Amino acid sequence: MSLRFNLIVTPFSNHRIRNRRETFPAQEFPVATSKSAVKVKCNLITSTDLVGKVREKINGKVDNSLEVPAIHPVDIPSNLCMIDTLERLGVDRYFQSEIDGVLEETYRLWQQKEKDIFADVTCRAMAFRLLRVKGYEVSSDELAPYADQAHVNLQISDVTAVIELYRASQERIYEEESTLEKLHAWTSTYLKQQLVSGTISDKKLHKQVEYYLKNYHGILDLVGIRRSLDLYDIDHYQILKAADRFRTICKDLLAFSRQDFNNCQAQYQRELQLLQRWYEDCRLDKLNYGRDVLRISYFVSSAIIGDPELSDARLAFAKYCVLTTCIDDFFDHAGSREESYRILELVKEWKEKPAEDYGSKEVEFLFTAVYNTVNELAEMAYVEQGRCVKSLLIKLWVELLTSFKKELDSWTDDTALSLDEYLSSSWVSITSRINILTSIQFLGLKLSEEMLSSQECTDLCRHGSLVVRLLNDMQTFEKERRENTKNSVSILLEAPKHEGAITEEEVISKIKEIVEQNRRKLMQMVYQRGTIFPRKCKDVFLKSCRGGYYLYSNGDEFTSPVQIMEDMKLCYEPLTFHPLEANNGGNKN
């Protein structure tokens, strides 16, 4: 048996390669080459049977029927399970038109309170989550019957249902959604108790619960997909009686997903080599200070912008992560105040100088790295956007370096700041804004000046950046206090008594509340339909926010990488696929 893929090969550079067809045996994967990831040609009409269509598509069968029958309600549970599976395995992009059709019909049935959705707790929770994430107006009040654990009759075997309720509760986007708040409280407690008591006998399910509870909003696509491939288990959906339908496609879908992941890995490894060459060309390897974040920057960038077709966007994001970190470290520790000012002056002038005019090798290397990278990206963006965006890119650098300067001045002069004064510039200095607004120039979408200067764009930047900034502050305030620098935690701790000085525990609690408020507002904006910003762009803001949770929820992974080193190894090791595993549809050990 073999899997037949329709391949559209996307190169690493801007040069295009013609399409071709290949057949890969299901258990004999090709050696990774410089070609991009597999892309299956999507030319199927939305069908009543998503499970069947997935089977047909990954086996190269095409239904060109013009008939688009209505989806029978009985198909909805299995179709929702298939959507969730495709998303968790990272191959949903190949079936987007089919997924959109199923969700449109699901929303119609949701409005009618169709019993096949509402009669089953797992199906209702999953439908709510998938619809809300896609921007459909669904009320959390429909989950009110499950808000109180006392009203839910749970058996030991109901862990899967509780997981779905827990995941649904994480999609709270309004402050007043008390149903989701209550739901989150008891489901998280219940799942933790199940872990502690050892009542989850299924080892894969046990690991899945651990993973969700550890840092749900910090689950990056790349890491989450790799975990899901390891923990893939068809029996996860047995409560919806969908397992029998899934079992026939289980091994094909898993083989297809692993093949796709391996192809993405091959492209990521090639791009990492390109990034390394850029790093050396910029002479950043000659800087004798700061954090070595090249691989970490690329890893985070590939987890935020994972689509193999978006190589330029991913590399732009990674380059900016590296550049902003190098300059941030220079402002913080390595450079003098005058040298730091000099970098800002040079960016404002935007002219190359003779080497002796820079004042130091470090200033020369940093400015020329920014200068050459921005000029190169501006040329590429001109092709993508059909207009010159260089002035925007330079403006973003001036804004960032100005925020660095403000922070440097406040630390050096020991200026007393209020929390609002600190946050007014620190949301820019966390670098999310410049990284995102530069990289989205390469998503294949035309972005007008009106869009980029809109209040929506500013708010997306601010809410997402504040989440990352405050998460960072909570993990680094001890170190920064020793270095006599300030952040939101130390500012609140040092507040005068008449302003309501509070304990460290109370400060952390207050900042977590601000983080949650901004995260919910960001999710609300990203999910909202009909706005000036395309959803594809808004998703980058949300995924960057997840990157902040990933890096700063349990330490400072960017400065002292621990978990990220394990995940990098896990994500860059090629997946293997064993015949026995395929035949069994996965095991539970």
From Swiss-Prot:
Tissue-specific expression: Mostly expressed in trichomes of leaves and fruits.
An annotated GO BP: gibberellin biosynthetic process
Keyword Phosphoprotein applies: no
UniProt enzyme class: lyase
Catalytic function, reaction form: 9alpha-copalyl diphosphate + H2O = (13S)-vitexifolin A + diphosphate; peregrinol diphosphate = (13R)-9,13-epoxylabd-14-ene + diphosphate; peregrinol diphosphate + H2O = viteagnusin D + diphosphate
GO terms for MF: (13S)-vitexifolin A synthase activity; 9,13-epoxylabda-14-ene synthase activity; magnesium ion binding; terpene synthase activity; Viteagnusin D synthase activity
EC id: 4.2.3.-, 4.2.3.189
Cofactor comment: Binds 3 Mg(2+) ions per subunit.
The protein's required cofactors: Mg(2+)
Location (main, coarse): plastid
Transmembrane domains' residue ranges: none
Coiled coil: none
Organism domain of life: Eukaryota
Binding site for Mg(2+) 3: 472, 476, 480
GO cellular component: chloroplast
Binding site residues for Mg(2+) 1: 328, 332
Location in the cell: Plastid, Chloroplast
Span of the annotated motif DDXXD motif: 328-332
Keyword Transport attached: no
Alphabetical keyword list: Chloroplast, Lyase, Magnesium, Metal-binding, Plastid, Transit peptide
InterPro entries: Isoprenoid_synthase_dom_sf, Terpene_synth_N, Terpene_synth_N_sf, Terpene_synthase-like, Terpene_synthase_metal-bd, Terpenoid_cyclase/PrenylTrfase
Record remark on domains: The Asp-Asp-Xaa-Xaa-Asp/Glu (DDXXD/E) motif is important for the catalytic activity, presumably through binding to Mg(2+).
Family of the protein in this entry: Belongs to the terpene synthase family.
Function, in words: Involved in the biosynthesis of labdane-type diterpenoid including cleroda-dienols, and peregrinol lactones and furan derivatives, dopaminergic diterpenoids that can bind to dopamine receptors in the human pituitary gland, have probably ability to lower prolactin levels, and are used to treat menstrual cycle disorders (e.g. premenstrual syndrome and mastodynia). Terpene synthase the catalyzes the conversion of peregrinol diphosphate to viteagnusin D and 9,13(R)-epoxy-labd-14-ene, and of syn-copalyl diphosophate to vitexifolin A.
Name of the molecule in the record: Class I diterpene synthase 2, chloroplastic
Species whose genome carries this gene: Vitex agnus-castus (Chaste tree)
Lineage: Eukaryota, Viridiplantae, Streptophyta, Embryophyta, Tracheophyta
Gene: TPS2
